């Protein structure tokens, strides 16, 4: 069998018509986990509807529709392989909640693919001031997606013009630099997601294209296709050696077993026999067993695993979604009284001042928080201070803000526990701002509930 391939998570960003579905569909279709039967079924349907030529996007649209109707389609459909990696596409945008998903996302992306439409007029629209492209790229960078690949799509529509390609590369390089990426470490690939040029095999339509290069710590890496660029992602480091943080998605009561909290391990490891503390509930108890997909995990749950674990002497009323479990003996999680965050306002119709109290989505918590003090306005790219104690901030601004939650919540500094240190600010049914937590004022509440099981385990 050999060693299992490393898993990486990709997020695909770009303007609404850049061809994200077709390109992603093509990769999944050619290198992916969609079984032949499903493909044949979709192709037949596409042909019957006269959408035969549209098959990649059609396959993806079908999957998307099923996903949105809440049919939990086999998640393998969103996976494909490169020689080195198992790749999961964690969000194909065009999704209303794309921004929220990216922040509270079920997982952190290791790399973003920015798809740019090369068509005349299309490129200009996608990258314009108010373009979604800018917002998505900025988000990816702010939220710690350190690696980027740029695919310049629809090159067939400009007859594989080298001049057009160079013009777009130059503009896009400036664009990604403004967002915060170093263009030298970003591969640029001209593709046709539709016809498949430079997707998996090198194209015969652009003799002028000599391939992409990117600078890495280990030196220069070269390749030709989009698949090779994905294969050249630098392997991500998974935080299993950090203390445990496991935000709860749900808490179930299961007859004959008892209370079973469920969630995704973000950092550290959760094992049977461990004594965990839930914050901000301030409840401490012993973990009896840990399982995933109804199978016991003898070695415990690791970062990225969605696990259920059985706890003793705790009722469903004691803990809830949005609580965070951690190791009671190793930097246990705590509730917070306030926290300071770098907030970037994306789209708010008015001005935001002290006293504004929208809902924050941070990991699985969904809690109203007050903008207590606007400490300073900063330059979004460099982080340098521009103004002390601004009265207001508006769309496009970045500021350091002291936030006070309306009820107990557990968050962490982004530098220490990234998934618990980024949040979306929701108001008027949209994401109006995003934030990265700089520091947390933790509440040291004495007392709290320590179960008999925990006391017993401590004596062992």
Swiss-Prot record:
Residues 70-74 are annotated as: G2. Residues 5-240 form the tr-type G domain. Residues 192-194 are annotated as: G5. The keyword Oxidoreductase does not apply. The modification N6,N6-dimethyllysine is found at residues 3, 317. CDD domains: EF1_alpha, EF1_alpha_II, EF1_alpha_III. This protein promotes the GTP-dependent binding of aminoacyl-tRNA to the A-site of ribosomes during protein biosynthesis. The modification N,N,N-trimethylglycine is found at residue 2. This is Elongation factor 1-alpha. GTP binds at residues 14-21, 91-95, 153-156. Pfam families: GTP-eEF1A_C, GTP_EFTU, GTP_EFTU_D2. It is found in: Cytoplasm. Keywords: Cytoplasm, Elongation factor, GTP-binding, Methylation, Nucleotide-binding, Protein biosynthesis. Residues 153-156 are annotated as: G4. InterPro entries: EFTu-like_2, G_TR_CS, GTP-eEF1A_C, P-loop_NTPase, T_Tr_GTP-bd_dom, TRAFAC_GTPase_members, Transl_B-barrel_sf, Transl_elong_EF1A/Init_IF2_C. The gene is TEF. The modification N6,N6,N6-trimethyllysine is found at residue 79. Residues 14-21 are annotated as: G1. One of its GO terms (molecular function) is GTP binding. The modification N6-methyllysine is found at residues 3, 30, 317, 391. It comes from Yarrowia lipolytica (strain CLIB 122 / E 150) (Yeast). The keyword Nucleotide-binding applies.
């Amino acid at each position: 069998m050999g060693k299992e391939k490393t898993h990486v998570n990709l997020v695909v960003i770009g303007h609404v018509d850049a061809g994200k579905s077709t390109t992603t569909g093509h990769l999944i279709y050619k290198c992916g986990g969609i079984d032949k039967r499903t493909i044949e079924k979709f192709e037949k349907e596409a042909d019957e509807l006269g959408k035969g030529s549209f098959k990649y996007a059609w396959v993806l649209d079908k999957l998307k529709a099923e996903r949105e109707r809440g049919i939990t389609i086999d998640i393998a459909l969103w996976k494909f392989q490169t020689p080195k990696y198992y790749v999961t596409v964690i969000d194909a945008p065009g999704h209303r909640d794309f921004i929220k998903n990216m922040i509270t996302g079920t997982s952190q992306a290791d790399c973003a693919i920015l798809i740019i439409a090369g068509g005349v007029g299309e490129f200009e629209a996608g990258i314009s001031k108010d373009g979604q492209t800018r917002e998505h790229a900025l988000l990816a960078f702010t939220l710690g997606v350190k690696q980027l690949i740029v695919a310049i799509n629809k090159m067939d529509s400009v007859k594989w013009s080298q001049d057009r390609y160079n013009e777009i590369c130059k503009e896009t390089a400036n664009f990604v630099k403004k967002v915060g990426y170093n263009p030298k470490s970003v591969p640029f690939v001209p593709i046709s997601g539709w016809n498949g040029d430079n997707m998996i095999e090198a194209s015969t339509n652009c003799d002028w294209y000599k391939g992409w290069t990117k600078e890495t710590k280990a030196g220069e890496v070269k390749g030709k296709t989009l698949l090779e660029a994905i294969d050249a992602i630098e392997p991500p480091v998974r935080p299993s050696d950090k203390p445990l943080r496991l935000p709860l998605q749900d808490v179930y009561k299961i007859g004959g077993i008892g209370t079973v909290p469920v969630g995704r391990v973000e950092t550290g490891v959760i094992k049977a026999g461990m004594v965990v503390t839930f914050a901000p509930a301030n409840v401490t108890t012993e973990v009896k067993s840990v399982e995933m997909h109804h199978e016991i995990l003898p070695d415990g749950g690791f970062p990225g695993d969605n696990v259920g674990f059985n706890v003793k002497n705790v009722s469903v009323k004691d803990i809830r979604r949005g609580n965070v479990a951690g190791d009671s003996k190793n930097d246990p999680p705590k509730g917070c009284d306030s926290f300071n965050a770098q907030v970037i306002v994306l789209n708010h119709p008015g001005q935001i001042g002290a006293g504004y109290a929208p809902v924050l989505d941070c990991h699985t918590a969904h809690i109203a928080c007050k903008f207590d003090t606007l400490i300073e306005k900063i330059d979004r790219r460099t982080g340098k201070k521009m103004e002390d104690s601004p009265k207001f901030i508006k769309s496009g601004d970045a500021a350091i803000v002291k936030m006070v939650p309306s009820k107990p919540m557990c968050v962490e500094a982004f530098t220490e526990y990234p998934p618990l240190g980024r949040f979306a600010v929701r108001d008027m049914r949209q994401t109006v701002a995003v934030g990265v937590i700089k520091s947390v004022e933790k509440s040291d509440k004495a007392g709290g509930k320590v179960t008999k099981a925990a006391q017993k385990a401590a004596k062992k």
